[in-house]
Design a protein with these regions (language model features):
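N-terminal Sec-pathway targeting helices
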Residues: 1-18
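Membrane-interface motif at the C-terminal end of an N-terminal transmembrane signal
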Residues: 18-36
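N-terminal leader/targeting segments and the immediate start of mature chains
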Residues: 30-76
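N-terminal mature ectodomain segment of secretory-pathway/periplasmic proteins
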Residues: 58-137
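Short, hydrophobic/aromatic-rich segments at coil-to-beta transitions
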Residues: 71-78, 99-107, 174-183, 207-209, ...
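Short, solvent-exposed aromatic-acidic interface loops
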Residues: 110-116, 133-139, 212-217, 246-252
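Flexible, processing/modification-adjacent segments and terminal tails
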Residues: 130-189, 218-220, 276-277
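Gly/Pro-enriched, hydrophobic low-complexity segments
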Residues: 181-271
Length: 278
């Protein structure tokens, strides 16, 4: 009997190891990129960099855009990377659709062997957030709305001209390489401003990281939320981040890494931003 139990235990251990090995191989396979967003982008109008910016913000504006800032109304940004779910780092591909300063749709696929094993549609439209997750839908929560609004303004790093051209946005000086970015609320009424502390590279003037307090779920309090830029690329007459990591401060390591492969500006997204999937 004991010999049978030992053999059974060995068999189970071998099976678990084999399954774990197969899954490990699947996690190494990068998914194919999404098809290019096949809508021609129009030429972008430009305006002068506004006067009166804090030193760090003005240096960033000129380092990333030159003397003129493009006027951005919408964007479709696509790429790949990875997302950490339950402690496991899954390859991912994603497409984010924006109405500048107003709303977004996130479509994310976590993959195994290059095939989707989880699909997520997240929306921030008309000032309200909605998350369509495999285990249910989250909406109608003020904390979700506030978190989504901060997400919108953090992701505006892919269209940084909006931080200069939207009259609701305000920059405040901190020091030579740091500034405070104050952003509007969306549909939620609050007395305390929503703001990011934005740190810039003292040598290049380019943005290094954005830090704020953000809700992670509908139950807890705000937690430190960090967006860090790892690399840059040219798109739409601007330098935009080509690689970004997102970290909850109390977790100590990124849970999402995004590598941009395409950014298209001022295309019609009125229907696409309310759609599902790719």
């Amino acid at each position: 009997m004991m010999r049978l139990v030992r053999r059974l235990g060995l068999s189970i251990a071998v099976t678990i190891a084999a399954v774990g090995g197969v899954v490990g191989l699947g996690l190494r396979v990068r998914p194919k990129p999404f098809p290019a967003y096949a809508v021609p982008a129009p030429p972008l109008d430009t305006v002068e960099i506004p006067a009166g910016l804090p030193e760090a913000a003005e240096r960033f504006a000129r380092a990333s855009m030159g003397e003129q800032a493009p006027v951005i109304h919408s964007a479709v940004v696509s790429g790949r990377g990875w997302i950490r779910l339950g402690g496991v780092k899954f390859p991912a591909r994603w497409r984010f659709v924006y109405q500048a300063g107003e709303g977004y749709r996130h479509y994310i696929e976590a993959t195994l062997f290059g095939q989707p094993v989880m699909k997520v549609n997240e929306y921030y439209l008309d000032g309200h957030g909605r998350m369509e997750l495999p285990f249910g839908v989250v909406e109608g929560e003020e904390k979700v709305d506030l978190a989504a609004n901060l997400g919108l303004w953090a992701e505006t790093v892919w269209m940084p001209a909006v931080w200069l051209t939207d009259p609701r946005v305000r920059w405040e000086a901190v020091d030579e390489s740091t500034a405070r970015l104050v952003v509007p609320f969306g549909a939620v009424t609050r007395d305390t401003p929503e703001a990011f502390t934005v740190e810039f590279d003292p040598d290049t003037g380019l943005l290094e990281r954005m830090v704020t307090l953000r809700y992670r779920d509908t139950e807890g309090e705000r937690k430190g939320w960090i967006n860090e830029v790892q690399a840059w690329m040219e798109a739409g007459g601007m330098l935009i981040p080509s690689r970004v990591t997102v970290t909850w401060e109390d977790q100590g390591e990124p849970w999402f890494s995004l590598e941009v492969e395409e950014a298209v500006y001022n295309v019609d997204v009125d229907k696409y931003i309310r759609a599902k999937g790719i």
